[in-house]
Amino acid sequence: MGIKNLNSVTASLRGTVLLDKSMLWKGKPEKSLVSYKISCGGRNSRGVITVRHRGRGHKRLYRIIDFKRNKVGVSATVERLEYDPNRTAFIALLSYDDGEKSYIIAPNGLKKGDVVISGEGSDILPGNCLMLKSIPVGTFVHNVELRPGNGGVIARSAGTYAQLMSKDGVYVLLRLSSGEIRKVLSDCRATIGIVSNLDNQNVKLGKAGRNRWLGIRPTVRGVAMNPIDHPHGGGEGKTSGGRNPVTPWGVPTKGKKTRKRNKSSNKYIKRVSDKG
């Protein structure tokens, strides 16, 4: 794919950098693989805001993605690559030899007409899915399972990956794109390759309206609020907040570790993320 640097014809286009989607499918998604998605705007069933800065956004259809890849031994041809409004990665529509269709997260380099397959003994090619114990050390993978058969949960967003570092009995060591090194059961499945849309990190939306299309509402600074609304609020004139940065609920922020020290999964993490 790539990115588009737009000319400054208007103020909202100045500095705008968008994704080039010219190589993606321009029609509607596969009808049998979509479902309606009702946006809740960050509210719960009582109408109370539980997640701030969430809005309605543009209407979307949810694409049903096959994260399990449990159709073993049946080859599938890539019909097309599509944009998915529900995630940063692109998706690929597969047509299996037995007539079934499914969506998968598209790895970088996958193109229309490629053949992919899931199962042991598959070639180490982008889009093929194998157990971690069957993948050579040093290979980049994505859509990695944490529990065998439950479907991939690690490395699913644009440009992410996990690199297989070593094998140790029933476990393998994976280095994630965040720098974290983690133990995973060798019977878990993973898909070969790095997730597509590597240029997503270079996108600059250019105007507030594009954020609203994505369902993101404005974020108000605490020092601009009243004392009732935020610990940094109030004061005469402009103030600095008067204390170390905290959330609206008084929890230290900007670098404060929030992970529980006694979490059961700590024993599987050999090195924490470089990004905190």
From Swiss-Prot:
**Which InterPro entries does this UniProt record tie to the protein?**
NA-bd_OB-fold, Rib_uL2_dom2, Ribosomal_uL2, Ribosomal_uL2_bac/org-type, Ribosomal_uL2_C, Ribosomal_uL2_CS, Ribosomal_uL2_dom3, Ribosomal_uL2_RNA-bd_dom
Q: Name one GO cellular component term.
A: large ribosomal subunit
Stretch list, region Disordered = 224-276
Judging by the UniProt lineage, the source's domain of life is Bacteria
- The keyword rRNA-binding belongs to this UniProt entry's keyword annotation: yes
Q: Give GO BP annotations, semicolon-separated.
A: cytoplasmic translation
Question: From start to end residue, where is composition biased (Basic residues)?
Answer: 254-270
**Coiled-coil ranges (or none):** none
Its Gene Ontology molecular function terms? rRNA binding; structural constituent of ribosome; transferase activity
Keyword tags: Ribonucleoprotein, Ribosomal protein, RNA-binding, rRNA-binding
**Which PROSITE patterns has this protein been placed in?**
RIBOSOMAL_L2 (PS00467)
Query: Main role?
Result: One of the primary rRNA binding proteins. Required for association of the 30S and 50S subunits to form the 70S ribosome, for tRNA binding and peptide bond formation. It has been suggested to have peptidyltransferase activity; this is somewhat controversial. Makes several contacts with the 16S rRNA in the 70S ribosome.
How is the subunit organization of this protein annotated in UniProt? Part of the 50S ribosomal subunit. Forms a bridge to the 30S subunit in the 70S ribosome.
Question: PANTHER family, per this entry?
Answer: LARGE RIBOSOMAL SUBUNIT PROTEIN UL2M, RIBOSOMAL PROTEIN L2
Q: Which family does it belong to?
A: Belongs to the universal ribosomal protein uL2 family.
Q: What is this protein called?
A: Large ribosomal subunit protein uL2
Q: Which organism is it from?
A: Ehrlichia canis (strain Jake)
